Amino acid sequence: MKYAVRTFNPEQSVIKEANNYRDIINEFKENNKDFKVGAIYKQDNVVQCNVYSTHGLFIDMLEITMQ
């Protein structure tokens, strides 16, 4: 399936192929060891999760939308 992955910075938005949204979040975690992913919110075809620094400061939000 194709997913649109967005952040607060529109230049970082990408389309990714994945089996499900959890694969995208896990890939993000592997590639960004300095960040923590907070609670995951899912409603219909949209998944959102907050991204925090290792010190607990809010940095960004990932929004994953099924295409």
Regions found by a protein language model. Give the residues of each.
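Short aromatic-glycine-(Arg/Gly/Cys) micro-motifs in beta-strand/loop hairpins
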Residues: 1-12
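A short, exposed loop/beta-hairpin motif centered on an aromatic-Gly-Thr core
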Residues: 10-20
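Short acidic, gly/pro-rich beta-turn/loop elements at beta-sheet edges
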Residues: 15, 28, 59-61
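A short, charged, amphipathic alpha-helix used as a generic interaction element across diverse proteins
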Residues: 18-41
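Short, mixed-charge low-complexity intrinsically disordered segments
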Residues: 33-67
